[in-house]
């Protein structure tokens, strides 16, 4: 099993190109099942989760072709892919494939909408709480699907196609909104999605579906209206920049010091997180094609955050921000409201010398003067990168084990950090 070795204490300086967002690319790839024509996606990151979904789509008969890369990206990043679902041979998504990645469950929506049936295994992915699929199933049932759970599979059928309906989510759900959008695009009549997720990745999916011929209004608000159409066609669409990767590298610079330009990204994708970061004493400057992050001396000021759906502070940056706060000059309080059991990184940060106390959904971080390198173990995707950030600022060497979690969500991480001066090396098993 691969490990990453980091020798900390070096400020980051240089330029980091931000990859396409994994959390946008996954539903976009799944949307290829809605049409028999070709969907071309630009700026798709090279990640383990993307490869896993490619295998799942291939199992259904989707043809996948890599045709190039996004201009401005490095050799190891930013691929352009063409997906063609003209010969779907199977509407079953088996356990051995779906269990590797939670988002793959979303294939149930386009399969059901286009073919009238789907059999999809209950999902896997990061082990952060239960994250049930109940809301996704509820949305499909509202649209007229007949659903049963049989042997660990969700079996969905519709006799005469899906029909528009009013869907009100009791809590904000990104996955549920993705599923509702894809299913409603081919449903008969009008679908209204209330309490819809407002995340940029939802907007990106809606924009791509619109290019394919869908009729969608209100994406980016809490109320989305979809007028179903009889068929969707092919399209060409660029995946939006990864706001979580942007925030992660910004926090790495804030923690280690230095001056880094994050390019191929947009400030509006991360407004709340950048505001919080600025309050810690980090200088944030907008660039024409990204942001510049600087911290050249002075301590890190403590700050309190509560994770919330967009436009609030992202849960996917909670672990990274906690790593930053371990060196703050004072106490900070971090409340996690999106997922339960998302503090698994705490005990590993403690191995580096962090002082963190947990009380339910609240983490109280007492800043320390310094961290010291130690062997640590990644527990999930975002927790693993928080250990990278901590290790970059720690004295001495840190060995991070189980880094396959990193490969699920961070494209060319060692190369990007290494070009900015980080002393980071992957040791192959």
Swiss-Prot record:
Active site: 126
Chain positions recorded as UDP-N-acetyl-alpha-D-glucosamine binding sites: 102, 131-135, 316, 338
GO term, biological process aspect, one: UDP-N-acetylgalactosamine biosynthetic process
Subcellular location field: Cytoplasm
Pathway linked to the protein: Cell wall biogenesis; peptidoglycan biosynthesis
Family: Belongs to the EPSP synthase family. MurA subfamily.
Protein name as it appears in the record: UDP-N-acetylglucosamine 1-carboxyvinyltransferase
Natural source organism: Methylorubrum populi (strain ATCC BAA-705 / NCIMB 13946 / BJ001)
